[in-house]
Amino acid sequence: MFYYIIAFVMICLDQLTKWLIVKNMMLGDSYPVIDGFFYITSHRNSGAAWGILQGQMWFFYVITLVVIAGIVYYLQKHGQKDKLLGVALALMLGGAIGNFIDRVFRQEVVDFAHFVFGNYHYPIFNIADSSLCVGVILLFIQMLLDGKKTKESTT
């Protein structure tokens, strides 16, 4: 249950921040938080990461539902045994559902976190994207730890 609370909190944070952006900013508006480095920029994305597969909503609906089902399955089957895995899956679940809500109700995803590194503008993202990425990183760490345990037990 704890892991579903983490996912729920991430969904709420994601949807609240997106609602604030849509309500208070025009598309394309940008406000510096740390001038020259971090901006809040109102942006929309009808595709996936970095704007790939623009407008392919049916594809994202199917893939996201399959991913959500897989995450819930693994969370139920393995998440309770391993805290790091549970947190990783919860963050991934929250991120997947957060962006899925946008795709279903807006047919696009609201993005706003905009980082600039010199002349390079990192693709604009949101809380759900961050939740997914942190979850995937934690999942990789868990996999490395599991691999190390397996290697130690066989030697």
Swiss-Prot record:
The residue ranges crossing the membrane are: 52-72, 85-105, 124-144
Gene Ontology cellular-component annotations: plasma membrane
Localization terms from the record: Cell membrane
Q: Which GO terms describe its biological process?
A: proteolysis
Question: Sorted alphabetically, which keywords does the UniProt record give?
Answer: Aspartyl protease, Cell membrane, Hydrolase, Membrane, Protease, Transmembrane, Transmembrane helix
Give the positions the UniProt entry annotates as the active site: D111, D129
Per the UniProt entry, the signal peptide is: none
InterPro entries in UniProt: Peptidase_A8
Q: Which PROSITE patterns match?
A: SPASE_II
What is this enzyme's catalytic activity, as reactions? Release of signal peptides from bacterial membrane prolipoproteins. Hydrolyzes -Xaa-Yaa-Zaa-|-(S,diacylglyceryl)Cys-, in which Xaa is hydrophobic (preferably Leu), and Yaa (Ala or Ser) and Zaa (Gly or Ala) have small, neutral side chains
List, alphabetically, the Pfam families matched: Peptidase_A8 (PF01252)
The pathway this protein participates in, as annotated, is: Protein modification; lipoprotein biosynthesis (signal peptide cleavage)
Domain of life where this protein originates: Bacteria
Q: What membrane topology does the annotation report for this chain?
A: Multi-pass membrane protein
**EC number(s) of the enzyme?**
3.4.23.36
The record's GO molecular-function terms, alphabetically, read: aspartic-type endopeptidase activity
Summarizing the function annotation, the protein's role is: This protein specifically catalyzes the removal of signal peptides from prolipoproteins.
Q: Which NCBIfam families match?
A: lspA (TIGR00077)
Q: PANTHER family recorded for this chain?
A: LIPOPROTEIN SIGNAL PEPTIDASE (PTHR33695:SF1)
What name has this protein been given in UniProt?
Lipoprotein signal peptidase
Origin species: Bacillus pumilus (strain SAFR-032)
